[in-house]
Structures are given as C-alpha cells and as structure tokens.
C-alpha cells in the first residue's frame, strides 16, 4: 500500500520510496539469495494499514495514553520490527514527554547491550513520531506472569541476573533508568530479557495490560523511598526497583500495597519494611537476597556490582565471569558481507555506512544493516554451516572469520565424530575381511591333489573340477597348479613357502574312479583282481599372462597313464619343478637294466611335436643307444633322475618357445599301435623308468 499523506521520509534510498512495489530480488554477490531477497508472498500476506518510508505499519501490539506500539515490516529485508507511534498533539500536552521525547533516542544511541532493545530508526511526520525498534517475539514478561500466576525460582534467577547485567551496563555508562518495572521487560525468541523505554516513564502502560498492579502501576509502585520523599538519589534507586521486580516474579504480587492508595502510606510501609508475606517454597538464599535489595536505607542497600556478585544470583553460573559489552561496534566486528552488499548493491555510500554503524546512530542505514545482519545470522544458525558455500565475498577476510563464530565449535565436534565413526567402520571392514580370508584359506590346503598317498584310493580316478573359491584362492590360479610334496608333513605352495600339511577334512571330496568307456581302454594285467588301472589327471597350466588360468576340461588324450599300483614317488629336492606336459611321448618301452619298470604314455593332439618326430634314431629318443648308455653309465648326466637336482631345469621361456614352434602334424597312428607293452610288476612297489624322461628334462 502507498504511504499515507504526510508520512514520507527522505532517509532511505530513492528506489525504496518511489513506486508501489518494493524491491523483491536483490543482488546475490555478497549474501545468500534467501538473505538478500524478499519473497512477494511475504509482502503480500503482511496485514498493514499504511506504509511509512520503508516500513509497513501493521497490527497493534499495545496502547497507552498517547503512544501505541505496532508491528511493522521492513520491505527491503522482509524482517519484522516493533514501531512505537507517538501522537504529536497528545505528546505536546505533556511537558515531561515534550522535554524527554528525544532523550530516549540519545540514550539508546549511547547504549549497546544484548539485554537492551536496539533502537533502529526514528521517523517523524506531520502528526506522529515513529520509533523503530527490534521486535521481541517472546512477548511481555507480564503476560507470562498472568499465565503462570508466578515464575519458578530457577527461571526468575535467570531473568533477574540478565536484568542486573543490563542495569550494570547502564550505570557504567552513567545512565539511571528510574523506571524499571515488569511492563518494561520483554522476551526475545530465545527467552532472554530485553529492557525497553528510556526516558519515557509516563508511557509505562503502552502495552495496554490491565493487571493487579493497575491501581499502583507506574513509578510509585516500583520507586525507591528516596524518590517518593523527593530526596537526593543515585543509581541505587534502580537496585530497589530490581527487588520489586524480583518479588513480583516469585509471588505474582507487589511487595508493598496500601488500600486505599496513598503515597504517604506507601512510603511509610516501605520505611517500616512492612513487606507482604513471602511464599514458604522460596529458598533462604533467595529471601535473603530479596530483603537486601528492598533495603529502605540507600547507604545499607547494595550497589549494582555488589548485587551482581550475590551467591544466589550466581548459582549454576560458576565460571561465567562478568562480560563487559562495548557501547560501540568495532571495525573488526562489522559484517563485511552486509556492508559491501549495502554499498555496492543497494546504493549506500560505503563511508556513510561505516560511520553510522560505528556511531550507532538510529537511522534507516542502521536499520538495514541490523536487519540484514540478523537475517544472515539466523540463516547460518538454521543451516548449521560454518560458512557460506555459495556467493561468498572474497574482498575482505573479516567476513570469513565472523561466520565461524557461531558454529565453529559445533562443526568441529560433528567433524571429529564423523572421523571416529569412519575409523570404526574401516576397522570393522578390515576385521570382516580377515575373517573371510581365514575361512577361505583352508580350501586350497585340503584339496585332493594335496592329499597324502595313503589317502588315495587304488581304483580309477574320477575327473574333478575346482570350485570358484579354489580358483580365486591364489588370484585366479588353480590350487592344483605346480604343488608337490617336498618333505614329510610339508608341501611347497605357489608362494614359495612351506605350509604344514593337515589331514583332509572328512567332507573333502576324494579322487573317484573314472567310468568313461570312451576315454579309457581296458588293460589286462596278470596281477590279481586287486590291481587295476589308475589314471592321474593333471591340469595343463602355462604360466602366461595372456592366457586365463582356468581349469580346462580334462580329456582322455590329455592325461598320464601310469601302470601299476600303488604308486610311490621318491621325494625330490625343493629346487625341482614339475613341468607342464608340453611334449608328446609315444612308443615308449621299458629300458633294459632297470628292475623296477614303469611305462607311461601321454596323448595330446595339440602338442607341437608329432609321434613320428620322435624316432628311435633321434638323439632325444628314449630308444637311442647313446641315450641308454649315457643314462646307465653316466649318473651325473642331467637326464638322469638321480642327478636331476644338480642341473638347471628348463625355464618357462624355453617351454613356451618349444610350444609355439610350428611343426606340421602328421597323421596319428591308431590307438592300438601306440599302446605300450604291459609288464607284470610287483604289487607293492612301482617306480619311473629314468629313460622315459630323456629329452623331457
């Protein structure tokens, strides 16, 4: 709504005054959008009767003989304020009001304290004065006493202590209030005391409450005896008034009352200490402190500093020393984000903004700064953030420090708790991983290939595939890969360390007999019904990074066939390696001169060597005479089994090069022609023929 006629003001920027619509969206360079802007809904829904300057005048909060208190809204910030409207015509009729009307503004310009209301702006029109103050949303303390009948002692202690702190600040500044009463005590949103009305004692009842104190409300009911006697007085008159307020909080009544009302009778009752009875539920310390405040003799009455040091007043406030608040804002305490926003975005002169804030002079500039700063603090408090993440002002470092004043401690505590929680979670994950590894580790230790010879059955061996857990136990390598017995009770693992042998678990699958008629041929041996054909399945594993180390399907052509049972292997040196079956052997026969004979064949169509390539006349053929003589005569030859550990074995690079040689394969001979001759052997012992390994090592 437009401003009423005659209610214009020239303090604010021109764009706040001209036009029907106030600015809605302000710049967001220095402040968050929710702080610098005002929603249209807020302006539209605020009920008001008129506009004066940058303020919308709303509902009435209280009313007195010549003044009214109304709720207002600042259109530039969207913040609510309290506006005291004083009628000029009625005020001129009262000489005391006319004399001291400007005194309140001068006093509040000198005073700055958290328990004293801040005067923000003063407007004057043809018919009225407008005093703009911060709005105390907690209401009046008188209203709280009406609702509860009285206030509990612990809560009254808090209010009295805050009131004494505010009065002590006034006395240090040389200001005596002289009109301290329940009606002048307001509560903010945090339930803290706010002291109002300086120099306008006759306006004590502007909030319009009708209460039991109405017959004796005002200065006489709260005034000290020296004031009623019109004697010289000092700051201790405020100490007496504090005692009356304390009595009213604890009991809901006044300490001195007379019927009918008479100033002479009231004064006499004060001098005689004829106080109304106190409730029995009050503590002796509270009663003693109350009586000391209501001492009629000013010389015996404590001053404000002595009252502040009382034991009852400081109960539950140990370690909280008296904090002195400066009456002026220091330059380093300024909110630089708000100052820069006002100077660069709202059109205020930077030097004027600084001077007004430091001098605490009530005007529109101070009101804009105060309201924006309060809005910013509430935003940071609600968001629980130590700093503004978006639209941070980088021109001055002071604003960076001020954002951490409220939430630095809470942020550090929350961060330390998060770090501790993360550390506990990581430890739990590590423990779970260790337990998982411990559960998975026995799987490769108790595999079939590592079972001792005594546990291997004498029948045909059944093909077995490794499970997924076994394949992953060595990073993708099969647990059957190049593991051999080195000494009794130990085995060599792929990690080149000795692991103690454990007896297999009863549930560990054992090698079963293979019943595949297509992959095996029946062999007639004259060794009794207990001797049967035994097949040992060996997995081909080439240690190549380009080939996945997976368990291949075993075929009849890819196996060693060892004749004779049981099989006995002599222990080998730890430096020996079991080579992967690369070469193809056929047409092998027992070597003369060896009593213990064992024949084996290895069929692999994928081998690069063909059966014909291994001719008896070749130097690598097991039937070569030179080979036989060398084996039988020279035991130090690397081809000899007994001296194999003394010579270097074939490396994996040589094996791969031999495997990759391109040899034109020839047609294979029938299986019957490649079958070795069967020889009867002792059932209790079988060994390898050393000549069969010639050329392989």
Swiss-Prot record:
Residues 607-626 have a biased composition (Low complexity). InterPro entries: Kinase-like_dom_sf, Prot_kinase_dom, Protein_kinase_ATP_BS, Ser/Thr_kinase_AS. ATP binds at residues 61-69, 84. Gene3D superfamilies: Transferase(Phosphotransferase) domain 1. The active site is at 179 (proton acceptor). Residues 405-424, 460-473 have a biased composition (Basic and acidic residues). Keywords: ATP-binding, Kinase, Nucleotide-binding, Serine/threonine-protein kinase, Transferase. One of its GO terms (molecular function) is ATP binding. It catalyses: L-seryl-[protein] + ATP = O-phospho-L-seryl-[protein] + ADP + H(+); L-threonyl-[protein] + ATP = O-phospho-L-threonyl-[protein] + ADP + H(+). SMART domains: S_TKc (SM00220). Pfam families: Pkinase (PF00069). Residues 586-600, 627-637 have a biased composition (Polar residues). Its EC number is 2.7.11.1. Residues 405-480, 586-642 are annotated as: Disordered. Transmembrane segments: none annotated. Residues 55-313 form the Protein kinase domain. Belongs to the protein kinase superfamily. CAMK Ser/Thr protein kinase family. SNF1 subfamily. PANTHER family: HORMONALLY UP-REGULATED NEU TUMOR-ASSOCIATED KINASE, MAP/MICROTUBULE AFFINITY-REGULATING KINASE. This is Hormonally up-regulated neu tumor-associated kinase homolog.
């Amino acid at each position: 709504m437009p401003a009423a006629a005659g209610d214009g003001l020239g303090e604010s920027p021109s764009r706040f005054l001209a036009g029907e619509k106030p600015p809605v969206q302000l710049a967001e360079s220095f402040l968050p959008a929710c702080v610098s802007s005002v929603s249209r809904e807020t302006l539209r829904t605020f009920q008001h009767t008129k506009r004066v300057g940058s303020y919308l005048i709303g509902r009435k909060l209280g009313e007195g003989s010549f003044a009214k208190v109304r709720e207002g809204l600042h259109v530039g910030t969207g913040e609510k304020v309290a506006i005291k409207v004083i009628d000029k015509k009625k005020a001129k009729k009262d000489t005391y009001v006319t004399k001291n009307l400007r005194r309140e503004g001068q006093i509040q310009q000198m005073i700055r304290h958290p328990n004293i209301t801040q005067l923000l702006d003063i407007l004057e029109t043809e018919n009225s004065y407008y005093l703009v103050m911060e709005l105390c949303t907690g209401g009046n303390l008188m209203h709280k006493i009406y609702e509860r009948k009285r206030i509990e002692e612990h809560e009254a202690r808090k209010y009295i202590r805050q009131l004494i702190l505010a009065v002590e600040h006034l006395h240090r500044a040389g200001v005596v209030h002289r009109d301290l009463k329940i009606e002048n005590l307001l509560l903010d949103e945090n339930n803290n005391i706010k002291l109002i009305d300086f120099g306008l004692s006759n306006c004590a009842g502007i909030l319009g409450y009708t209460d039991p104190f109405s017959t004796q409300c005002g200065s006489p009911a709260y005034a000290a005896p020296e004031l009623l006697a019109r004697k010289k007085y000092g700051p201790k008159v405020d100490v007496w008034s504090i005692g009356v307020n304390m009595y009213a909080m604890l009991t809901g009544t006044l300490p001195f009352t007379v019927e009918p009302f008479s100033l002479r009778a009231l004064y006499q009752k004060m001098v005689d200490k004829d106080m109304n009875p106190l409730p029995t539920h009050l503590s002796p310390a509270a009663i003693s402190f109350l009586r000391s405040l209501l001492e009629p003799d000013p010389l015996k009455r404590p001053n404000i500093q002595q009252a502040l040091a009382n034991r009852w007043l400081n109960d539950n406030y140990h370690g909280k020393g008296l904090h002195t608040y400066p009456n002026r804002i220091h330059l380093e305490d300024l909110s630089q984000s708000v100052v820069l926003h006002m100077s660069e975005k709202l059109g205020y002169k930077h030097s004027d903004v600084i001077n007004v804030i430091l001098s605490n002079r009530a005007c529109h500039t101070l009101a804009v700064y105060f309201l924006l700063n309060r809005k910013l603090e509430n935003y940071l408090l609600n968001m629980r953030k130590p700093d503004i993440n978006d639209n941070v002002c980088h021109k001055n470092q002071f604003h960076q420090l001020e954002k951490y004043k409220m939430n630095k401690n809470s942020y550090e505590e929350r961060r330390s708790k998060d770090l501790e929680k993360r550390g506990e979670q990581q430890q739990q994950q590590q423990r779970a991983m260790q337990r998982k590894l411990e559960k998975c580790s026995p799987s490769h230790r108790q595999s079939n290939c590592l079972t001792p010879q005594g546990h291997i059955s004498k029948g045909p061996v059944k093909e077995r595939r490794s499970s997924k857990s076994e394949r992953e136990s060595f990073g993708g390598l099969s647990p059957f890969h190049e593991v051999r017995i080195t000494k009794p009770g130990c085995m060599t693992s792929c990690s080149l360390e000795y692991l103690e042998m454990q007896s297999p678990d009863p549930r560990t699958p054992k090698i079963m007999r293979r019943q595949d008629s297509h992959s095996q041929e029946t062999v007639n041996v004259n060794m009794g019904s207990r001797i049967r054909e035994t097949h040992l399945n060996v997995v081909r594993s080439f240690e190549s990074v380009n080939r996945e180390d997976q368990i291949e399907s075993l075929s009849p052509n890819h196996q060693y066939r060892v004749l004779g049972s049981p099989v006995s292997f002599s222990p080998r040196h730890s430096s020996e390696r079991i080579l992967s079956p690369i070469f193809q052997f056929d047409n092998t026969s027992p070597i003369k001169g060896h009593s213990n004979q064992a024949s084996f064949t290895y069929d692999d169509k994928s081998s690069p060597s063909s059966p014909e390539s291994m001719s008896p006349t070749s130097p690598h053929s097991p039937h070569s005479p030179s080979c036989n003589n060398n084996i039988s005569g020279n035991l130090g030859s690397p081809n000899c089994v007994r001296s194999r550990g003394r010579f270097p074995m074939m490396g994996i690079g040589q094996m791969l090069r031999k495997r990759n040689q391109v040899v034109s394969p020839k047609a294979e001979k029938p299986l019957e022609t490649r079958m070795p001759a069967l020889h009867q052997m002792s059932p209790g012992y079988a060994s390898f023929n050393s000549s069969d390994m010639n050329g392989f090592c």
